[in-house]
Amino acid sequence: MVRRLREGVWLLELGLVPPFMSNAYLVDGSALDGESDGLTLVDTGLWWNEPPIADELDGVGYDPEDVDRVLVTHYDLDHVGGLNRLAPEFDGPVYVGREDLALLAGGTDPPLFHHKGLFHRASRQLSRLPDVDWRPLSEGDTVAGFTAYHTPGHNPGHLAYYHEAASTAFLGDLVWEEDGALTTPFWGDSYDMGRLRESVRGLASRMPAFDVAAMGHGDPLLAGGSDALRALAASV
């Protein structure tokens, strides 16, 4: 189901049924500031979404080939798996945190005796991603109006993205939403909860103020997003 969050920003609710659901976001830069930044998809859902991601895009009036780029918050199957459903129509670059690119490309082997490391080792073998133009991002890098913030913990290369014109922070799995507030994810889904909590505190102190908190799981907060992030940071 597609939901408009504000001018030029849409939520794409992807996956199957809870808890196998995740959020992706579509941002039309030209609708925000009149500039030709094109169409950006933030995360892509699972390899099998119901409804399919192409149908979600169609609900906003776009096709996969209209997407100019994909920004990935982190390498987990419920955030990158939908790339298989976008290809071959989508042929733009896919941006991901430098450390997570090493994970998915095999440049770094996840720790074998760690619950999430073992999961990522299995993911690389069981769910192959399409041959796309992967491009690494680091703290402070900018792409089409988005600024990347390195927020490790859930994954080593987890990124959050800030878009000033949209007054929106795309937070991935740094935080989840529960009962209208932000919370940290389940420990079993993260590499290092200590680093994750540090990332929450660090992001709350260095990201500019924003209205919309757009996370990977839960209902986006449409107002007071940065206040909600600071409230969480004060509690972890």
In which residue ranges do the predicted regions lie?
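Haloarchaeal acidic low-complexity proteome signature biased toward cell-envelope/secretome components but also
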Residues: 1-14, 34-36, 50, 70, ...
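Conserved beta-strand hairpin/beta-sheet module of binuclear metal-dependent hydrolase folds
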Residues: 2-59, 160-177
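Core dinuclear metal-dependent hydrolase active-site scaffold
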Residues: 26, 34, 138-163
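Residue-level marker for buried hydrophobic side chains located in beta-strands
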Residues: 40-42, 71, 94, 168-170, ...
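Metallo-beta-lactamase
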Residues: 46-48, 99-150, 156-231
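Active-site metal-binding motif and surrounding structural segment of the metallo-beta-lactamase
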Residues: 50-96
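Short hydrophobic/aromatic-enriched beta-strand-loop microsegments
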Residues: 67, 91-98, 115-117, 170-172
